[in-house]
């Protein structure tokens, strides 16, 4: 797990997300506390529980983006889910325990990837031997093998096509037992059963020598790794370092005066309670305790309020962070300052057609103004509004770019207003088009 300081985490998030200092600080402290807990010993380590977070803020201000960037930073198993995807246990649909099963799968992939790095050198040599077997046969003399090995290492054989046998890891469907909630633990995974019975299934693939290396290195790495050890390590990592991000939590809050329980509302909240508090979930790899998994939840709370959540669930989300709506200055900074800003993306896309785009300062002001106006008059969708506006402005250039190779387009305020001004003024039209 990464041991960035809170200040480093915030500055890393600043590269991609504008504003929202409070939310960044909250997740940075939460992430650092995971590392601090790892440094403790014995009983105290068991007692320290993560402080779960509830992010509240309008759509398009960076709630989900903060979680995505945090996952990359953490180097820890991370799963993002929408609360609306789940139904109460006993109904058709996914139950909330599936979140933890997904987390374990992600942890296994993470641990396997790390372990593969440790055995990469040995796996590379084994892969080379298998390529030689495919080129000259297993019975070839050592002299022949050596001469081909030299050619291989010089890259002379890169384009030659060979047939290789690799283990077949194609996902075969799990049998699900109707009427049994949680039966999709993977009770009877037929490929596992067949694989063990027949000593591992393989399939033949045709590929060039150059392309065969990554496939064979992965295959050989897996042979060198102890799969049981990987699973045990992944279960430990899931329990100690796992982060679960639950989006749209406001959509499962019962609205005041609303009637009907709603299969995917209060029931889902009740099912989430033990998960967030700490329980043991059965997975096909073994039981996973959720006591030390960090839960970050977020919601826009346009219609409902955080107090509409079950009181017990509110109590289990002790850290509340409010994200502010974006201002005109924020829109300007989103267009220019972020690492892969929209303007940089469009310039890069057009360069593939040998078309040069230049944006003047007043164009950026105009784009920000239009986005703010539309958010105020139509519907506030935050930073996502910029994508709509940019697409509309660059529609003509994007369409004709292949015929205009070598051309340079300078986009200024006049151009922006010409393309979008009329629509922005006519509120009825902009409701449909922007």
From Swiss-Prot:
Pfam families (UniProt xref): AAA, AAA_2
Keyword presence, Cytoplasm: yes
One Gene Ontology term of the molecular function aspect: proteasome-activating activity
Keywords: ATP-binding, Chaperone, Cytoplasm, Nucleotide-binding, Stress response
Superkingdom field: Bacteria
One Gene Ontology cellular component: HslUV protease complex
Primary location group: cytoplasm
Location(s) in or outside the cell: Cytoplasm
Entries under InterPro entries matching the protein: AAA+_ATPase, ATP-dep_Clp_protease_ClpX, ATPase_AAA_core, Clp_ATPase_C, HslU, P-loop_NTPase
Binding site for ATP: 18, 60-65, 247, 312, 384
UniProt record, GO biological process: protein unfolding; proteolysis involved in protein catabolic process
Keyword Hydrolase: no
Function: ATPase subunit of a proteasome-like degradation complex; this subunit has chaperone activity. The binding of ATP and its subsequent hydrolysis by HslU are essential for unfolding of protein substrates subsequently hydrolyzed by HslV. HslU recognizes the N-terminal part of its protein substrates and unfolds these before they are guided to HslV for hydrolysis.
Subunit structure: A double ring-shaped homohexamer of HslV is capped on each side by a ring-shaped HslU homohexamer. The assembly of the HslU/HslV complex is dependent on binding of ATP.
Similarity section: Belongs to the ClpX chaperone family. HslU subfamily.
Name of the featured protein: ATP-dependent protease ATPase subunit HslU
Upper classification of the organism: Bacteria, Pseudomonadati, Pseudomonadota, Alphaproteobacteria, Hyphomicrobiales
Gene name in the database record: hslU
